[in-house]
């Protein structure tokens, strides 16, 4: 699990370094689609039941926090809207594939149906929860930012507070709403509650672990801006 966090979170910095803001928008689309496929799989991690897509879902909060910190609230909301649009398009495409009549030699359609027959409910639940929670996360991030600036007189300091203050609350809402919307009637109530508890424990860990990556992203951006300014002089 820790290796997954390091690879996925590290990938956000690579996308930022190579492609800039557009790279983070691209990463949002990739993470949104992949997480909604992975979430079908329930695994045992650290002795608890959890869905496999937790780290990828958490990475979308990391991306919006990085964008909020570097580029601003408007750009962060754009990332959220891209994630929603990506989910909507993927729902349509994944269901369109299932309408085709496979050839006699085909071997993939049964597996595709197994995966994507559950996709609409999961994706719609995810899309609605994502829209609500990510909008809240962006709003909360900037509310924390305004509060720390007013309280301590610095707009640069206390990144860790606005990052974790917004993400931990948002992750709880995301976990609770999505798990019940996606798995009610699919798993037992006991399993759903176990998923909620275990997933939030994981989300707490992933939320705390993403803070250094936000600091690194800000430092990378600041370094790039200095290079641009040096070239212009």
Question: How would you describe each model-predicted region?
Answer:
Residues 3, 25-26, 55, 80, ...:
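Hydrophobic alpha-helical transmembrane segments
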Residues 97-121:
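Membrane-interface interhelical connector segments
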Residues 38-47, 70, 92-105:
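Transmembrane alpha-helix boundary signature
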């Amino acid at each position: 699990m820790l290796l997954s966090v390091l690879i996925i979170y590290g990938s956000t910095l690579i996308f930022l370094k190579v492609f800039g803001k557009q790279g983070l928008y691209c990463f949002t689309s990739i993470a949104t689609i992949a997480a909604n496929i992975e979430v079908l799989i329930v695994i045992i991690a650290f002795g608890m039941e959890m869905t496999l897509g937790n780290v990828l879902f958490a990475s979308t909060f990391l991306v919006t926090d990085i964008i909020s910190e570097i580029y601003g609230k408007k750009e962060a909301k754009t990332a959220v809207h891209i994630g929603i649009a990506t989910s909507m398009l993927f729902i349509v495409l994944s269901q369109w594939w299932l309408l085709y009549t496979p050839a006699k030699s085909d071997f993939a359609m049964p597996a595709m149906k197994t995966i994507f027959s559950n996709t609409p409910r999961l994706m719609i639940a995810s899309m609605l929860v994502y829209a609500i929670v990510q909008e809240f996360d962006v709003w909360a991030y900037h509310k924390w930012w305004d509060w720390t600036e007013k309280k301590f007189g610095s707009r640069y300091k206390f990144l860790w507070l606005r990052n974790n203050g917004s993400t931990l609350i948002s992750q709880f809402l995301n976990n609770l709403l999505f798990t019940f919307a996606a798995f009610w009637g699919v798993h037992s109530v006991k399993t759903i509650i176990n998923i909620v508890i275990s997933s939030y424990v994981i989300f707490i860990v992933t939320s705390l672990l993403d803070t250094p990556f936000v600091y690194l992203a800000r430092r990378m951006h600041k370094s790039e801006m200095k290079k641009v300014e040096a070239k212009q002089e």
